Design a protein with these regions (language model features):
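C-terminal structural segment of proteins
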Residues: 1-276
């Protein structure tokens, strides 16, 4: 299938990109790994595509106060292989290792995945679990959207139609804390049937889940007995039956993955001096 006709512009600065995006029915193109398939299937039919790949300075990965800021054009591969993120917030590369395949990671962007807001994708639940944020630029200037407010529905984010996401902020892992991420998919690189990430910080235990709700879900399991954690999590999840899996199998995967990621995150915390 071929895309419906559209106009194309490639601005050379952020102000020009924001101005171009003011046109009706316009869409931003960064890595294109979500938008281009939607165009090809005519599930998206913008009148104008604004390609931001000509805007300098959006591909950086930098340490800032309390964490790491990832630019809108930083490719998944660069984020996955970043020594800075491996040191400051290892949950990000741990999850990115499960994202698609190398050819897609070489082009796709981490920030683009956040804006796409697919609840079956890894990056939205990671940002939500880490309580990170997204910076966006629009006609009214720049604003920050917290992860709790960012994901508002299936494939729907709080980024306005006239705004461009410029960077994501991933908070640093607290000293002595541990993280883990795992998922189950029919084939490596496919969308997960269920995925889970955990952050264990002292006595605090939080687990985030993908593919079991319309939006990324984070459950605080602090103080919950190990045998009861999965049941406590399932109260907040919506494991549905579809062509990929039954609801019963997804619930079983929640049980397995909850125990697994909490155990691994606890071991990682102990290894970093955060013994419990």
């Amino acid at each position: 299938v071929k895309p419906a006709p559209f106009d194309y512009v490639r601005p050379t600065d952020l102000a020009g990109a924001v101005a171009a995006l003011a046109a009706p029915d316009s869409k931003v193109l960064a890595g294109g790994q979500s938008l281009v398939p939607l165009l090809s299937m005519r599930l998206a039919a913008p009148s104008l595509v604004v390609d931001i790949n000509g805007v300098p300075g959006l591909d950086t990965i930098t340490e800032v106060g309390g964490g790491v800021r990832v630019g809108a054009l930083a490719r998944h591969t660069a984020v996955l292989e970043s020594p800075l993120l491996a040191r400051v917030q290892p949950l990000v590369p741990a999850a990115l290792a499960h994202v698609a395949h190398p050819t897609i990671r070489n082009r796709g962007t981490t920030v683009g995945s956040l804006v796409h807001a697919d609840a079956a994708a890894e990056m939205p639940v990671v940002l939500r679990l880490l309580e990170g944020s997204l910076d966006v630029e629009g006609p009214a200037g720049r604003r920050t959207i917290g992860a709790r407010e960012l994901f508002v529905g299936p494939l729907e984010s709080a980024v306005g139609p006239d705004e461009i996401a410029v960077s994501a902020f991933f908070p640093a892992l607290p000293a002595g804390a541990g993280v883990a991420f795992d998922e189950v998919a029919r084939r490596h690189g496919d969308y997960a049937l269920v995925g889970a990430g955990a952050v264990v910080d002292g006595d605090r235990i939080r687990v985030g889940y993908l593919s079991v709700s319309d939006v990324p879900v984070v459950v605080d399991l602090t103080g919950v007995a190990p045998a009861d954690r999965a049941d406590a999590a399932l109260e907040h999840l919506d494991a549905a039956t579809d062509i990929h899996s039954t609801a019963a199998y997804r619930r079983q995967l929640v049980r397995v993955l909850t125990d697994r990621v909490v155990a691994v995150a606890t071991r990682n915390a102990t290894a970093q001096g955060g013994g419990r």
